[in-house]
Amino acid sequence: MYKFSAIEIRDQFIRGDVSASAITQHYLNRIAKYDQKIGAFLSVYEEQAMMQAKQLDQKRLANQPLGKLAGIPIAIKDNILVKGEISTCGSKFLTNFKSPYQASVIEYLLAEGAVIIGKTNMDEFAMGSSTENSALQKTSNPWNLKCTPGGSSGGSAAAVAGRLSPLSLGSDTGGSVRLPASFCGVVGFKPTYGRVSRFGLVAYGSSLDQIGPLATNTADTALLMEVIGRHCPKDSTSIALGPEDYLSQFKDSIAGMKIGVPWEFLENLADEPKKIFQQSVNLMKQLGAEIVDIDLSILKYSLAVYYILATAEASTNLARFDGIRYGQRSPKAKTLEEVYDFSKEEGFGAEVKRRILLGTYVLSAGYQDAYYKKAQKVRTLILRSYKEAFAKCDLIASPVSPFAAFEIGAIKDPLQMYLEDIYTIGINLAGLPAVSIPNGFSKDGKPMGLQLIGAQKHDREVLNAAHILEKSLAFHPAIPELVKEETSA
């Protein structure tokens, strides 16, 4: 079962070849067997998932309509709210926080017959690139347990890579879906800003955050986008576009397409990732695409711009976690001021505190003009550079990360960790759609990813091109040795 795609699983269920209960139990068994080593899940909804599955079985037997995701288990990043369930955001601060309402994307998933199987680990409040900043547990990469799965959606990527769930949802503020997808050898898609509702997503950087799907292949990713990509009246930033057909509209060729490559921005890329990326570029040429050199040199400022704007938004968003309205209240506090101070001191981890301090600093009266407002101006220039690039090409190609997955604990310097996002953050600053697809392995057997970037609202074109390349790469979704079984029962 675990070797099948999500679409194949759904079709088998609809035909009556297998019950939703059997599908769900299969993945629950795999979680019980393998997740002790991987650590992808913070909570597993065993009873609730089986109840949902049995209801789907009854609907099928009664010949009632079944949704696009009928019978497919899905894992959810723990900053996306599921009503009545604990949502920790990977933080001690929210260890016992039960969501009083449902995220819009969860409503859409349930309406289409998906089975919510559990919540996945993440960097605390989505602040990190390795999932090492989770205050609750360690998550390992299924390809190499000594390595990180990437972050901040590391649990969601590890769950899919380990075949503990056919699909998962993550969130992407600066690369947090694409980077773990690259490290774990799966597909991760960051939609156009506003294409997927953020209602019920715990905010980190409100102008940057976007919920995105992870799967073993692009067709499953596109299927999930057909369900979650729609206008939501509860989200003021939601684009006024209805659901879109992806799979039925996919073309079968990229011949004649212009693919832009920002070679100047990639000049410091190490030899091995550069070689793997070059092989993908050569493949695009063989498939009839024209490779165009584009200028995105302004992206050398993207890291500074991102960490000014994202931290400024984070300091504002996390102000609500004060021990009174949300979160754990410090038992040491004797006054209202102490409740605020002690609760945050005890509840937040080091990286969250670092980013709140930086954000508060750049928003302070003496420095707002020098940092925050200047960063906003450069963000506008970055958006303009992308628009100029897309006047010359249809899509842009780049690596996802400067390197493959690194060992847990190997990067101590926060600035070095921030550089991991150098090829992904510009996309969030410009609100563009981008996908990471597996395009090879390093010499020591770690997956690496190719990033395809589209203009705003060209989500389908990005996934279409990724689908064509995926087939041409002959990269049949590889399965880590750790989680392979002799039978698919």
UniProtKB/Swiss-Prot annotation:
<feature type="active site" description="Charge relay system">
    <location>
        <position position="152"/>
    </location>
</feature>
<dbReference type="InterPro" id="IPR000120">
    <property type="entry name" value="Amidase"/>
</dbReference>
<comment type="similarity">
    <text>Belongs to the amidase family. GatA subfamily.</text>
</comment>
<feature type="active site" description="Acyl-ester intermediate">
    <location>
        <position position="176"/>
    </location>
</feature>
<dbReference type="InterPro" id="IPR023631">
    <property type="entry name" value="Amidase_dom"/>
</dbReference>
<protein>
    <recommendedName>
        <fullName>Glutamyl-tRNA(Gln) amidotransferase subunit A</fullName>
        <ecNumber>6.3.5.7</ecNumber>
    </recommendedName>
</protein>
<dbReference type="InterPro" id="IPR020556">
    <property type="entry name" value="Amidase_CS"/>
</dbReference>
<dbReference type="GO" id="GO:0050567">
    <property type="term" value="F:glutaminyl-tRNA synthase (glutamine-hydrolyzing) activity"/>
</dbReference>
<dbReference type="GO" id="GO:0006412">
    <property type="term" value="P:translation"/>
</dbReference>
<keyword id="KW-0547">Nucleotide-binding</keyword>
<comment type="subunit">
    <text>Heterotrimer of A, B and C subunits.</text>
</comment>
<comment type="function">
    <text>Allows the formation of correctly charged Gln-tRNA(Gln) through the transamidation of misacylated Glu-tRNA(Gln) in organisms which lack glutaminyl-tRNA synthetase. The reaction takes place in the presence of glutamine and ATP through an activated gamma-phospho-Glu-tRNA(Gln).</text>
</comment>
<dbReference type="InterPro" id="IPR004412">
    <property type="entry name" value="GatA"/>
</dbReference>
<feature type="active site" description="Charge relay system">
    <location>
        <position position="77"/>
    </location>
</feature>
<dbReference type="GO" id="GO:0005524">
    <property type="term" value="F:ATP binding"/>
</dbReference>
<dbReference type="GO" id="GO:0030956">
    <property type="term" value="C:glutamyl-tRNA(Gln) amidotransferase complex"/>
</dbReference>
<dbReference type="InterPro" id="IPR036928">
    <property type="entry name" value="AS_sf"/>
</dbReference>
<keyword id="KW-0067">ATP-binding</keyword>
<dbReference type="Pfam" id="PF01425">
    <property type="entry name" value="Amidase"/>
</dbReference>
<keyword id="KW-0648">Protein biosynthesis</keyword>
<keyword id="KW-0436">Ligase</keyword>
